[in-house]
Amino acid sequence: MTAIKEPSFRESVDLMFNRAASLMDLPPGLEEKIRVCNATYTVRFGVRLRGQIHTFTGYRSVHSEHMEPVKGGIRYALAVNQDEVEALAALMTYKCALVEAPFGGSKGGLCIDPRKYEEHEMEQITRRFAYELAKRDLINPSQNVPAPDMGTGEREMAWMADQYARMNTTDINAKACVTGKPLNAGGIAGRVEATGRGIQYALREFFRNPEDVKKAGMSGKLDGKRVVVQGLGNVGYHAAKFLSEEDGSRVIGIIEWDGALYNPDGIDVEAVRQWIVKHGGVKDYPDATHSAEGGAVLESECDILIPAALEGVINLSNAERIKAPLIIEAANGPVTAGADEVLRNKGTVIIPDMYANAGGVTVSYFEWVKNLSHIRFGRMQRRQEEARHELIVSELQRLDRYLGDAWSMSPDFKAKYLKGADELELVRSGLDDTMRIAYQAMSEVWHDRADVDDLRTAAYIVAIDRVSKSYRAKGL
């Protein structure tokens, strides 16, 4: 039997783009202008480590400059290649357009296994990579603003920001050259949890729409829904934690590199996370059944499947066996174009990656604005809000005394109402609002157009329309 060839990640993104673009009336040539990647820079640089020079290959792709700066993460992984980086850069363009973040799309990567190097060696490598990018304006607050991705985090972003600042000593906005930095290096509260929190807000908004929930063959709210998470990294961990602790969902399956855990009664996400930190994997975790083959749990009966690791985990080889009626793409491109068609034909509802995992770039946008304004969110108005609330509470207390037993304030009302919003609360509020508005834009297309039968196509139509309007406004 001849094996079916899957399209590459880049080809999958283009196929999904083409499906949406075919339903639009774009001016001649503009469709291709939006689809193609503007530029990809490949750098090979040497770093002296352990007595010899090691050569590393890195990429930074700029997909679209309809808005500047361009924005997108930098990942560290051995599998990084030009095809992957260009696909991810394209997704960033559409993602930013969908959530109305004022950026074009970009993405970067370095071919490296971070586990093989000491911290001081990783710093040397990261600083040299940042130097190579910054001297070509591929790291710059007004040109190209990287962020963390797979294999990178706050530590790497702090090194990159410092390297840029050393090279641009008079740039007062130097901190805005990257986002995802630690709080004490110009970061913002809520950035680490942002993508996982965005997954939670996306699911909440989906379940606020009963007709959409019905399309997935479900009813009710998130409470009690059975969840399987593939990948318990930063995104998967936070999404699973918030859904189980705040929304009453039951995480019944967790899939990691060394197998999968399954417990129909629910799994303690925090306990599994601590187990992974201590032991390096999920094997031998005591409170769930371990399976060496993660595919069995991926294909198990559940209500919500959250692929939160690499691209292409749901493909033509396993799509028919996926039983979840609702998939939310926490990772970039976890469902191939072929698998997407199979799942759509089965009636599976997919909340697409370009919307679902946009929490990261949304909060990165907030961090970038914070760095450019040089002031913490809430600093100017928090105490003034508390003073105004105090006036209202004082009047309510007078009313309470006057009415006696006929009416009284709730015991915790005063404490909750008097507390002004801090930066974390403002960030979460802004993210929640962003995810709601973006979902409504997708949903409107999904419901109003007879030729659109899935959320992914709807998301692409919204994003492509916004990018095309931006290009046309510039005179293209």
Where are these regions (language model features)?
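Adenosine-phosphate binding glycine-rich loop
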Residues: 3-8, 206-207, 325-476
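Rossmann-like adenosine-cofactor binding region
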Residues: 259-350
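N-terminal ligand-binding/catalytic initiation module
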Residues: 1-194, 200-202, 206-207, 356, ...
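General beta-strand structural signal in soluble alpha/beta enzymes
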Residues: 87, 171-172, 253-256, 306-307, ...
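Structural motif
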Residues: 54, 59, 109, 143-144, ...
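Conserved active-site and cofactor/substrate-binding residues in soluble primary-metabolism enzymes
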Residues: 8, 12-15, 38, 80-83, ...
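Flexible, glycine/charged-enriched surface loops at secondary-structure junctions
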Residues: 27-33, 100, 138-147, 171-174, ...
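Glycine-rich phosphate/diphosphate-binding loop of Rossmann-like nucleotide-binding domains
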Residues: 189-299
